[in-house]
Regions:
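Second-shell loop/turn segments in exported
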Residues: 14-22, 41, 102-106, 151-153, ...
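Soluble metallo-hydrolase cores and metallopeptidase-like ectodomains found primarily
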Residues: 62-67, 71-85, 89-91, 139-217, ...
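Structural recognition of the beta-strand scaffold that forms the well-ordered cores
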Residues: 102-103, 123-126, 157, 191, ...
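Metal-dependent peptidase/peptidase-like ectodomains
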Residues: 199, 248-346
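Alpha-helical metal-binding/catalytic segments enriched in His/Glu/Asp
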Residues: 35-36, 106-107, 117, 126, ...
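His/Asp/Glu-rich mid-to-C-terminal helical/loop segments that flank catalytic regions of hydrolases
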Residues: 232, 344-408
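N-terminal capping segment at the start of a domain
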Residues: 1-23, 38, 132-145, 209, ...
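Noncatalytic luminal/extracellular "stalk/propeptide" segments of secretory-pathway proteins
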Residues: 8-98
Length: 408
């Protein structure tokens, strides 16, 4: 793909597109039209998602109102209680949660939320941002249904600067007022098919949604540009395997698009030889990585290919937090490619994720390497990757998908 078209796609999609929103649907239609302009046929496949519109969110700490955003899908109501700052997960620290509104560090994951519930918290406060940045942005987060499991606590998210002020002032009490409308809607996967000589498939995935503050250029319109470029390439070049390209919706809300696809197409997964996922490529700086959720032979293959083609790549075996994982959980070998820049170079999930961190020449180089790998797989007499998930990857999948708590 020419770099001018790559840049145009980034520019045309430079807006927030959260999962299930009208803006996400607009991006899905744009990807379908872009495919059509390239001579490719694409269609949208809807799946149901939980949605919410917050009508009021107020946090008061010691009588002072703190700017906040209410957690989506966390219910409605109000609660006032003593404030407690939780920094650890040992029994003593957790014992302080009972009857309190709890301020905590980091993300509200499944196990942290279980700890809050089981130890009697009555509400929660999270924070994001950086105390050294000029902005006072606040991410609009959600209490994911698979985290809450029907047990909802009122919660808000605030800026890190205000979190520091709250703790520094030794605040004693907090009050949360949250009113929202919760309902169901649709997100969409966008799918392109290129039939091959065999019905067996290689699937390419990349998510096109973003978080609430982000234009999502690096994370992850870059991956979408990548698989669109590969669809353009393979439409004009041989491939023995049939190829399917899936632009996944609502990844940032918990891999919802790829999970929905694996449910809707479960019977077809037996014919999928490999999943190739792109999530964050083409930024100006950063190391190129390949995370393999499959046998270690594929790790070695990709490392050797990098040496053969003169391309720096760090391949390793693990579970990647992206759309490759639901497929791997169904036993399909998967590999994710990314150029990992880190928060100091290309921060994600905030307003700094824009096309300014991208370089079209680097995009082309990254896509060329992934295409070279994919072409070898797509034209193999038989895809050499074993269709068997190693036991250590099954263990990691159990941990990632919250079936088992990760050992400390």
């Amino acid at each position: 793909m020419k770099k001018e078209l790559m840049k145009k796609i980034f520019d045309d999609t430079a807006y927030v597109r959260t999962g299930g929103s009208d803006a996400e649907k607009r991006a899905a239609e744009y990807l379908r039209q872009t495919a059509s302009d390239l001579g490719l046929e694409a269609h949208l496949e809807p799946f149901e998602v939980e949605l919410a519109t917050v009508e009021e969110a107020v946090l008061t700490v010691d009588g002072r109102e703190i700017p906040c955003k209410g957690y989506l899908l966390a219910g409605s109501g109000e609660v006032e209680a003593p404030l407690y700052y939780l920094t650890e997960s040992d029994r003593y620290s957790l014992s302080g949660c009972k009857g309190k509104i709890v301020l905590f560090d980091g993300y509200l994951g499944y196990w942290r939320y279980r700890e809050l519930l089981e130890n009697g918290a009555v509400g929660f406060i999270s924070y994001d941002g950086n105390v050294n940045y000029a902005d006072r942005d606040i991410d609009h987060r959600e209490l994911r249904p698979h985290v809450a499991k029907g047990e909802k606590l009122l919660g808000v998210n605030i800026n890190a600067k205000d979190a520091v002020d709250i703790v520094n002032s030794e605040a004693k009490t907090a009050k949360i007022v949250l009113k929202q409308r919760e309902y169901k809607g649709n997100s969409h996967n966008v799918i392109i098919d290129l039939p091959g000589e065999t019905p067996e498939q290689i699937i390419f995935t990349a998510h096109y949604d973003s978080t609430s503050l982000s234009q999502g250029a690096y994370d992850n319109m870059s991956g979408c540009v990548g698989i669109m470029a590969m669809a353009e390439y393979f439409a004009k070049n041989p491939h023995r395997y049939s190829l399917r390209f899936i632009f996944c919706g609502s990844e940032e809300r918990g891999l919802l698009g790829s999970k929905a696809y694996c449910i809707q197409h479960e019977a077809e997964l037996k014919d999928v030889a490999l999943v190739i996922n792109l999530d964050m490529i083409g930024c100006i700086m950063g190391k190129f990585i390949s995370c393999v959720t499959a046998e270690t032979a594929l790790v070695n293959y990709i490392s050797y290919l990098g040496s053969e083609l003169g391309f720096q790549v760090k391949a390793y075996q693990d579970v990647y937090s992206s759309d490759s994982t639901p497929f791997a959980d169904k036993g399909v070998p998967a590999v994710s490619f990314a150029r990992a820049a880190g928060r100091d170079l290309a921060p994600i999930h905030n307003s700094y994720d824009t096309v300014a961190v991208m370089k079209m020449e680097q995009m082309q180089k990254d896509v060329d390497f992934i295409t070279a790998f994919a072409s070898r797989m797509a034209n193999a007499a038989i895809c050499p990757v074993a269709k068997e998930m190693p036991d250590n990857m099954k263990e990691k999948l159990d941990e990632y998908l919250l079936r088992k708590k990760k050992k400390a």
